[in-house]
Amino acid sequence: MTILVVTGTGTGVGKTVVCAALASAARQAGIDVAVCKPVQTGTARGDDDLAEVGRLAGVTQLAGLARYPQPMAPAAAAEHAGMALPARDQIVRLIADLDRPGRLTLVEGAGGLLVELAEPGVTLRDVAVDVAAAALVVVTADLGTLNHTKLTLEALAAQQVSCAGLVIGSWPDPPGLVAASNRSALARIAMVRAALPAGAASLDAGDFAAMSAAAFDRNWVAGLVG
């Protein structure tokens, strides 16, 4: 059994499509997969990341706790809706209930690593510590990514949360000078596990499966679950 939290260097970097791609690659390797997103914001505009993972990767074990209408940080979205954030133990129980032998459980955060997900001030990093999970960090290839990535990895290391690697959430075709340079530099910071092509979320399920299998190293994926 393996729990992996999927975080990012910010909002809109591609965490959901990375969750879906890794889930698809794992399922194609014969691994049972569950995906959890404890907190979802932006439901008023139709945001539903778990449904997107199900559509792209065919995962049926999908779990969430709190949903807020406005596309804001969870604490702000909850306040705007007159609702509360979930409690820390609720999130931990949700993840623990999904975890089982032979299964890869992916936990997608909201925004970046230190965004408040539960009261009082509980972040995805805290949850990772609670469930003994490593973190896969979704990054961009854009200017500024090196600083954002290093800050995220330092925040993980400060609480002894191991980094399972980096994934570039949207890789341009063709890559420009900045993107190509940043990809090389990112690989010197941590292992780059995959670079997903820009627009991957628009693929149909069959093409998405093929892309996912090609994007990740099969041996690494197979080794995620002991």
Curated annotation (Swiss-Prot):
Cofactor(s) it depends on: Mg(2+)
What the record notes about the co-factor is:
Binds 1 Mg(2+) per subunit.
Task: Name where it's found.
Answer: Cytoplasm
- Describe which pathway this protein belongs to, using the record's wording: Cofactor biosynthesis; biotin biosynthesis; biotin from 7,8-diaminononanoate: step 1/2
Molecular function via GO: ATP binding; dethiobiotin synthase activity; magnesium ion binding
Q: Which residues bind Mg(2+)?
A: T16, D49, E108
UniProt-annotated binding residues for ATP: D49
Active-site residues? K37
Keyword entries, A-Z: ATP-binding, Biotin biosynthesis, Cytoplasm, Ligase, Magnesium, Metal-binding, Nucleotide-binding
Q: Predominant location of this chain?
A: cytoplasm
Q: How is its activity regulated?
A: Inhibited by ADP.
Q: Which GO terms describe its biological process?
A: biotin biosynthetic process
Name the EC number(s): 6.3.3.3
InterPro entries assigned = DTB_synth_BioD, P-loop_NTPase
Q: Where does substrate bind?
A: K37, P38, V39, Q40, T41, G144, T145, L146, N147
This enzyme catalyses: (7R,8S)-7,8-diammoniononanoate + CO2 + ATP = (4R,5S)-dethiobiotin + ADP + phosphate + 3 H(+)
Q: Which residues bind CTP?
A: T11, G12, V13, G14, K15, T16, V17, D49, G169, P197, A198, G199, A200, A201
Q: Name one GO cellular component term.
A: cytosol
The similarity annotation says:
Belongs to the dethiobiotin synthetase family.
Q: How does it assemble?
A: Homodimer.
Role this protein plays: Catalyzes a mechanistically unusual reaction, the ATP-dependent insertion of CO2 between the N7 and N8 nitrogen atoms of 7,8-diaminopelargonic acid (DAPA, also called 7,8-diammoniononanoate) to form a ureido ring. Can use a range of NTPs; has highest affinity for CTP (KD is measured as 17.2 uM or 0.160 uM in 2 different papers) while KD for ATP is 331 uM or 75 uM in the same papers. Gly-169 plays a role in NTP discrimination.
User: What free text does the record give on domains?
Assistant: While ADP, ATP, ITP, TTP and UTP can be crystallized in the enzyme in approximately the same place as CTP, it is their phosphate tails that anchor them to the enzyme, their nucleoside moieties do not bind in the same way CTP does.
Which protein, by its recorded name, is this?
Dethiobiotin synthetase BioD
Q: Which organism is it from?
A: Mycobacterium tuberculosis (strain ATCC 25618 / H37Rv)
